[in-house]
Swiss-Prot record:
Protein name in the entry: C-Jun-amino-terminal kinase-interacting protein 3
Composition bias type Polar residues, residue spans: 184-196, 270-281
Predominant localisation class: cytoplasm
This protein's encoding gene: MAPK8IP3
Subunit structure, interactors included: Forms homo- or heterooligomeric complexes. The central region of MAPK8IP3 interacts with the C-terminal of MAPK8IP2 but not MAPK8IP1. Binds specific components of the JNK signaling pathway namely MAPK8/JNK1, MAPK9/JNK2 and MAPK10/JNK3 to the N-terminal region, MAP2K4/MKK4 and MAP2K7/MKK7 to the central region and MAP3K11 to the C-terminal region. Binds the TPR motif-containing C-terminal of kinesin light chain, KLC1. Pre-assembled MAPK8IP1 scaffolding complexes are then transported as a cargo of kinesin, to the required subcellular location.
Similarity field: Belongs to the JIP scaffold family.
UniProt KW Coiled coil keyword: yes
Cited Pfam families: JIP_LZII, RH1, WD40_2
Length: 1336
């Protein structure tokens, strides 16, 4: 019975029940009725019809009711199945809605915080604007006050100007009247001169041109030495003239003239003039340096001060006129003329300025000359010139002194003009002083206004600071209360382990007692969020532990109380059996099977403490899912018998599996015999079954060695030198002869002519991937690399020690290629100085970390690769660098072991000077260095050849092919202590080319086009790139943060040119070139789940979740969820639900190889699922499913895992030619060869191993004749051979037990003589399968 339903996602759910139809049920009832009818016939034949006459209707009624009840029961069971599916979907929907609600609440909280922050910012802006408004109002008020003061000053100046103008008018009138009086007095004295000289010109004589007008010429000549015509006396300077002057004015006249000059100076400030009035006349207020002003400047000043001239005081003007007239009179030379002049002066009181002092007319010495300080000249020179000119000149002057004439006014005005010009100059200087003082005053007023405004601003800021202080105090109180509440919640959350709760409470009490409340640290919002996040993480871990404990208890209960595997009889049969049986006693109870005490360890408890400290959960080396505890009352033989009985139950369950085909150690579905009618096609299908070709412990001598990880060597893009084949150098132990044959394909045939190597050479893609496999193992003290050839897995090629810590991951990196990203793009646009010891930058959330120098080949010695470096701060001994290259003498040294201490040699001081400095970020150095282990025996003189190795030749002294450079293929190893090691994959394997200490444990490594992405346990990605010379540059790398440091990046996978990273329950899709996260999506609805494995092929990526048995398929481009496959029902069906804990299935290894999906579980079970072709969908409806070999919807009975969830892909019609790796559990194949513990890894390498290699084939080809086809037939069909290796602890054959029975001891052969059987079964085993497939 098949039903098809549409689920909510638009997909199709196909159901197929295993119940019999209604017709089958009726046949059962009819058979029962027939038997009852025959029994009634016998009764009637023996007795009579009356015996069964009343019984017959009752029996018929009972049978009819039985039929109806059976049919109803079947319907109820179908409905129950549908309701269960609906319940699962509703639970999924509920989880999704719950997650969405949680996200909505988180977004609401974020929006609320953002709005509150924005509100605070707006409030701050409003306060700032109010403060600016108050400041502008204050400035406007100050400007209004300044305008009012300026207007008042303007009105005062207008009044002063009017007063000066009126005074100037009066002065001119007085001056005109004075001139007229003077002219009238001189009319009588000049009449005789006019009569004696009638022909004299009425114009001014030319001899007086030495006295120019009031333009400052004479004044400009004061500063130098003036030599008049016919004068032998020299004027040195103004000081000499002043000192030699014998003419002194009275004290009162000088005071009067000083007061007049002060009165003529306008002063708006109300202060007294600084003009000295004690010893000099009014003209003495002019300083000496200003009195020596040039002629041009004085002329310009005279023109500009025209208005100032009009404001002169009339009294001062009268004094100047009197002085002018006197000075003119003094200059006469003869005694007769001097007497006339003296009479005029005596008759005019206004001209007699100094009545007490008379000049000595006989004195002609310059020492007796008069210094006219009003004009600043020596009057003696004027007198001497006038005396030498003669009396005619005086007559001409008197004759031309006509008030109404043109020249008379000019002659008489000469002295007055000089005095007026002097006063104008003084006035202009005083005006300039006044203007300067006004400017200073205005500046002071503006400064006062500014200071008052700043005072108001500071007052406002002080008020705002006080308010903010009050708010912060309130906030501090609130935070203290919240801190108390959070601490109490933290104590409650940590109260599960009582000791931890006591420690926390005591710690909190002591800390709170020591630090006062006012000095305690104030929590920010980020710190509170971190505290809440840690609390949630503790809750998640608690839930995981509870889940693991619950599983453990369930499994323990199933071990201690095994269910009886017999079919119970119905109550009706029991009723009839009691009715018709001869005896009424019940049958004896069947003896239950002997049980054994089996304790199943939780997968999370093994390394929980390490995961708590290092953010990772490594599987403990000594943990096994099954531990047998001995009973005190049982002997060893009894326990062995119980164990054999337990495995016999598993064997019976495996052999009694109906409809299954066993071939080559695999349990195959019955479809392989039913699909094709002809046998040839069936044989072709059977050839694709993986054939186990090898199963042995990895190293026979060391039983304590545990496997961790492995990787095949990728040699793509690397070619040795052409002269390597003919140079006569034997290949090193690290050089694989198979690789040499493949790489020299176009050269003559090599000396190695084994059939395996010939076949490997003929394959087209064998040059890209070698058959060598590097396997990481560890003991209690060290980690080692074991190199094997998959074609000869029993032979160890080489092994060497890496470090003292566990190596968690390994990856093969190909050689440098032209398709790699350019190394310059790694730095983007950042200006990073390569020589700067602290060069680091942040590029869009990406931190650039650099070392001290960008050394092209920073090869550190192996001694720095222990748990901690030997030298301080991670500075190991490096090769000598000369001109940017490594010294060849240093590069050819023998490689030492990982834990060897370097022997100091004579070149130690030279290398010590060239050591690179420590990393720029101190988090990369070990804060507490511990001494590394001492030198190991046999490691000082180079690598000691292993006893199991078949190539004991020493290593060559040089590397002619350049394989020792990191530009060739390399192997990258990541350790638990954070060290990253780079070794060559082609030669000199033991030598470490590069090493670097990272912040946390290295969990995964991938390579994409010249970029190596390293996943760390603190949630960050370290991205490395090559240098300009093609070698890897570990000194400069980028750190990309994906989340909180409490969660680790568990796995990574390369999908085309992108990298998928598993972080918590999310998958981040990263572009390595731009170092940006392109897409993030949830792989599981529960946040506490973790993505553990990723496997990519075609357009699909398979994802596994921790503690989950369901595989999820996602589209590589659209990231759409395509399919779910649950392997737990399949494993339970194949191995039994209660046998050996196989009902608890967790996926620990995942690989896509040979067109198959390989799944390894935590119980050591290996499952191989063939991949199917693309599902063709149209509008979300299933139109067809074309399988590679079979169809999951074919008419086969219901199988575990047959319920396939197929989700619609809208873009599938656009990419119809792409391959999406769907798979169906109806085609799943389970291998009977497994491990005792979890499957640690799967590795796929090309190779072709003959089925009869040393009896290593686990299952005879007779069990499955298909895989033993001749090689020519395989090559004729263009099949591709691949070897798949699995590694794990111990070995179990589920058909015969875990290898401790007698059959295993007999099959072991000579191996049973080396170690006891029990220890051999617990050693680390590798199992190798060969798969032949046709590539799509």
């Amino acid at each position: 019975m098949m039903e098809i339903q549409m689920d909510e996602g638009g997909g199709v759910v196909v159901y197929q029940d295993d119940y019999c139809s209604g017709s089958v049920m009726s046949e059962r009832v009819s058979g029962l009725a027939g038997s009852i009818y025959r029994e009634f016939e016998r009764l009637i034949h023996c007795y009579d019809e009356e015996v069964v006459k009343e019984l017959m209707p009752l029996v018929v009624n009972v049978l009819e009711n039985l039929d109806s009840v059976l049919s109803e029961n079947q319907e109820h069971e179908v409905e129950l199945e549908l309701l269960r599916e609906d319940n699962e979907q509703l639970l999924t929907q509920y989880e999704r809605e719950k997650a969405l609600r949680r996200q909505a609440e988180e977004k609401f909280i974020e929006f609320e915080d953002a709005l509150e922050q924005e509100k605070k910012e707006l409030q701050i802006q409003v306060e700032h604007y109010e403060f600016q408004t108050r400041q502008l109002e204050l400035k406007a008020k100050n400007y209004a006050d300044q305008i009012s003061r300026l207007e008042e000053r303007e009105s005062e100046m207008k009044k002063e100007y009017n007063a000066l103008h009126q005074r100037h008018t009066e002065m001119i009138q007085t001056y005109v009247e004075h001139i007229e009086r003077s002219k009238m007095q001189q009319v009588g004295g000049n009449s005789q001169t006019e009569s004696s000289l009638p022909g004299r010109r009425k114009e001014r004589p030319t001899s007086l041109n030495v006295f120019p007008l009031a333009d400052g010429t004479v004044r400009a000549q004061i500063g130098g030495k003036l030599v008049p015509a016919g004068d032998h006396w020299h004027l040195s300077d103004l000081g000499q003239l002043q000192s030699s002057s014998s003419y002194q004015c009275p004290q009162d006249e000088m005071s009067e003239s000083g007061q007049s000059s002060a009165a003529a100076t306008p002063s708006t400030t109300g202060t007294k003039s600084n003009t000295p009035t004690s010893s000099v006349p009014s003209a003495a207020v002019t300083p000496l340096n200003e009195s020596l002003q040039p002629l041009g400047d004085y002329g310009v000043g005279s023109k500009n001060s025209k208005r100032a001239r009009e404001k002169r005081d009339s009294r001062n003007m009268e004094v100047q006129v009197t002085q002018e007239m006197r000075n003119v009179s003094i200059g006469m030379g003869s005694s007769d003329e001097w007497s006339d002049v003296q009479d005029i002066i005596d008759s005019t009181p206004e001209l007699d300025m100094c009545p007490e002092t008379r000049l000595d007319r006989t004195g002609s010495s310059p020492t007796q000359g008069i210094v006219n300080k009003a004009f600043g000249i020596n009057t003696d020179s004027l007198y001497h010139e006038l005396s030498t000119a003669g009396s005619e000149v005086i007559g001409d002057v008197d004759e031309g002194a006509d008030l109404l004439g043109e020249f008379s006014v000019r002659d008489d005005f000469f002295g007055m003009g000089k005095e007026v010009g002097n006063l104008l100059l003084e006035n202009s200087q005083l005006l300039e002083t006044k203007n300067a003082l006004n400017v200073v005053k205005n500046d002071l007023i503006a400064k006062v206004d500014q200071l008052s405004g700043e005072q108001e601003v500071l007052r406002g800021e002080l008020e705002a600071a006080k308010q903010a202080k009050v708010k912060l105090e309130n906030r501090i109180k609130e935070l203290e209360e919240e801190l108390k509440r959070v601490k109490s919640e933290a104590i409650i959350a940590r109260r599960e382990p009582k000791e931890e709760a006591e420690d926390v409470s005591s710690y909190l009490c002591t800390e709170s007692d020591k630090i006062p409340m006012a000095q305690r640290r104030r929590f920010t919002r980020v710190e509170m969020a971190r505290v809440l996040m840690e609390r949630n993480q503790y809750k998640e871990r608690l839930m995981e532990l509870q889940e693991a404990v619950r599983w453990t208890e369930m499994i323990r209960a199933s071990r201690e109380h095994p269910s009886v595997q017999e079919k119970k009889k119905s109550t009706i049969w029991q009723f009839f059996s009691r009715l018709f049986s001869s005896s009424s006693s019940p049958p004896p109870a069947k003896r239950p099977y002997p049980s054994v005490n089996i304790h199943y360890k939780s997968p999370t408890t093994a390394g929980f403490s390490q995961r708590r400290n290092h953010a990772m959960c490594p599987i403990s080396a000594g943990s096994r899912p099954l531990e047998f505890f001995p009973d005190d009352d049982c002997t060893s033989s009894a326990r062995r018998e119980q164990k054999r009985e337990q495995y016999r139950q598993v064997r019976e369950h495996v052999r009694n599996d109906d409809g299954r085909l066993q071939a080559c150690g695999w349990s195959l579905p019955a479809k392989y015999k039913q699909l094709s009618p002809n046998g040839g096609q069936e044989d072709t299908r059977m050839k694709n079954v993986p054939v186990p070709v090898y199963c042995r412990p990895l190293v026979e001598k060391d039983p304590t060695m545990k496997l961790w990880c492995a990787a095949g060597v990728n040699l793509s893009g690397w070619r040795p030198n052409e002269d390597d084949a003919g140079n006569g150098v034997k290949p090193a132990p690290g050089r694989d002869p198979l690789t040499c044959d493949r790489e020299g394909d176009g050269e003559p045939k090599s000396a190695h002519t084994s059939p395996e190597k010939k076949k490997a050479k003929e394959l087209p893609e064998m040059d890209a991937t070698s058959s060598r496999v590097w396997i990481l193992t560890s003991t209690l003290t060290t980690s080692k690399v074991v190199i094997i050839d998959a074609n000869q897995p029993g032979t160890v090629v080489d092994q060497f020690t890496v470090c003292n810590a566990h190596v968690l991951c390994i990856s093969s990196i190909p050689a440098a290629s032209d398709s790699d990203y350019p190394p310059g793009e790694m730095f983007l646009d950042s200006d990073v100085n390569p020589e700067d010891p602290g060069a680091d930058g942040v590029l869009a959330g990406i931190t650039l970390v650099g070392c001290a120098t960008r050394c092209n080949v920073p090869r550190s010695n192996c001694s720095s690769r222990g748990d901690t470096p030997v030298l301080d701060k991670g500075q190991g001994e490096v090769a000598t660098i000369a001109n940017g290259k490594v010294n060849p003498s240093q590069s050819t040294e023998e490689a030492t072991e990982a834990t060897e201490v370097p022997d100091p040699g004579p070149s130690e001081p030279e290398t010590a000077t060239l050591r690179p400095g420590p990393l720029t970020e101190h988090v990369f150095t070990d804060p507490a260095p511990t001494p590394s282990s001492g030198p190991q025996p046999g490691s000082e003189n180079g690598p000691e050849p292993d006893s199991s190795s078949t190539r004991p030749e020493p290593e060559p002294s040089g590397d002619p092919t350049g394989a020792g450079s990191s530009a060739a293929p390399t192997m990258w190893l990541g350790a638990q202590n954070g060290w990253l090691y780079v070794h060559s994959a082609v030669a000199n394997w033991k030598k470490c080319l590069h090493s670097i200490k990272l912040k946390d444990s290295v969990l995964s490594l991938v390579h994409v086009k010249g970029r190596v992405l390293v996943a760390l346990a603190d949630g960050t990605l370290a991205i490395f790139h090559r240098g300009e010379d093609g070698q890897w540059d570990l000194s400069n790398y980028h750190l990309m943060d994906l989340g909180h440091p409490h969660h680790s990046i568990r796995c990574m996978a390369v999908v085309y040119d992108r990298v998928w990273c598993g972080y918590k329950n999310k998958v981040h899709v990263i572009q390595p070139k731009t170092m940006q996260i392109e897409k993030s999506f949830d792989a599981h609805p529960r946040r506490e789940s973790q993505v553990r494995q990723l496997a990519w092929i075609g357009d699909g990526v398979w994802v596994s979740i921790r503690l989950d048995s369901t595989l999820r398929l996602y589209h590589a481009h659209t990231h759409q969820h395509l399919q779910d496959v649950d392997i737990e029902p399949y494993v339970s069906k194949m191995l039994g639900t209660g046998k050996l804990g196989f009902s608890f299935v967790r996926i620990t290894a995942l690989l896509v190889a040979g067109s198959r999906l390989w799944v390894g579980t935590g119980n050591g079970v290996v499952i191989s699922i063939p991949l199917t072709e693309t599902v063709v969908l149209h509008r979300g409806q299933l139109l067809g499913l074309r399988a590679n070999k079979t169809s999951p919807t074919s008419g086969e009975g219901a199988r575990p895992g047959g319920i396939i969830h197929v989700y619609g892909d809208d873009s599938s019609d656009r990419a119809a030619s792409s391959f999406i790796p769907y798979c169906s559990m109806a085609q799943a194949q389970l291998c009977f060869h497994g491990h005792r513990d979890a499957v640690k890894f799967f590795v796929s390498v090309p190779g072709n191993v003959l089925a009869t290699l040393n009896g290593s084939v686990l299952d005879s080809p007779a069990e499955g004749p298909g895989p033993a086809a001749p090689a020519s037939e395989v090559e004729g069909q263009k099949l591709r051979n691949v070897l798949v290796l699995s590694g794990g602890e111990g070995y179990i054959d589920f058909r015969i037990g875990d290898g401790e029975d007698d059959e295993t001891e007999e099959g072991a052969g000579d191996m049973s003589q080396v170690k006891p059987v029990l220890s051999k079964a617990e050693r680390s085993h590798i199992i190798v399968w060969q798969v032949s497939y046709t590539p799509e």
